[in-house]
């Protein structure tokens, strides 16, 4: 166990939109510390979003993340030799990071096109409450609902 709680890092906002959420997305897309490539991918995806939806890409992205954020998740808890999947509420910082992770994973899972196109498509899908990231959220909620009987084991 830790001696004390790890302090949250302050992430500086991204240079183009001046938004912390976009900076977090860039960090999630980034591989091997190649931030400029990640920025090109994200900003390219935002350009595609602007073309396809004719709306502000930042608003579309924010709404997409809001739609993907999970409210509940299950955590394993051992009680007397049996492991139960206990539904718990997700804290706000974790909600955001899960949403971003699921959007990026869903985009990476698609094959055969440039990453910026896949990312733009996934963000637009999440904005419209469809797509793989939304499915992941619904599956998580379904698991929590199915294990509702064990909610009294929360800690």
From Swiss-Prot:
Gene Ontology CC annotations of this record: cytosolic small ribosomal subunit; ribosome
Gene Ontology BP terms: ribosomal small subunit assembly; translation
Gene Ontology molecular-function annotations: mRNA binding; rRNA binding; structural constituent of ribosome; tRNA binding
Pfam families linked: Ribosomal_S7
UniProt keyword terms in alphabetical order: Ribonucleoprotein, Ribosomal protein, RNA-binding, rRNA-binding, tRNA-binding
Superkingdom per UniProt: Bacteria
Listed CDD domains: uS7_Bacteria
Family per record: Belongs to the universal ribosomal protein uS7 family.
Subunit structure: Part of the 30S ribosomal subunit. Contacts proteins S9 and S11.
Function: One of the primary rRNA binding proteins, it binds directly to 16S rRNA where it nucleates assembly of the head domain of the 30S subunit. Is located at the subunit interface close to the decoding center, probably blocks exit of the E-site tRNA.
Record protein name field: Small ribosomal subunit protein uS7
Recorded name of the encoding gene: rpsG
């Amino acid at each position: 166990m830790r001696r004390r709680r790890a302090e949250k890092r302050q992430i500086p906002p991204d240079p183009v939109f001046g938004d912390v959420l976009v900076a977090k997305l860039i960090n999630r897309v980034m591989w091997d510390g190649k931030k400029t490539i990640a920025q090109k991918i994200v900003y390219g995806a935002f350009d595609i979003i602007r073309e396809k939806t004719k709306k502000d890409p930042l608003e579309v992205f924010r709404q997409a993340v809001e739609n993907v954020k999970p409210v509940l998740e299950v955590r394993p808890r051992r009680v007397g030799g049996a492991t139960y999947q206990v539904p718990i509420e997700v804290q706000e910082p974790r909600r955001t990071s899960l949403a971003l992770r699921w959007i990026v994973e869903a985009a990476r899972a698609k094959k055969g096109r440039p990453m910026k196109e896949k990312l733009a498509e996934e963000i637009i899908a999440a904005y419209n409450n469809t797509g793989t990231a939304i499915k992941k959220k619904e599956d998580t909620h379904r698991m929590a609902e199915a294990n509702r009987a064990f909610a009294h084991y929360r800690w």
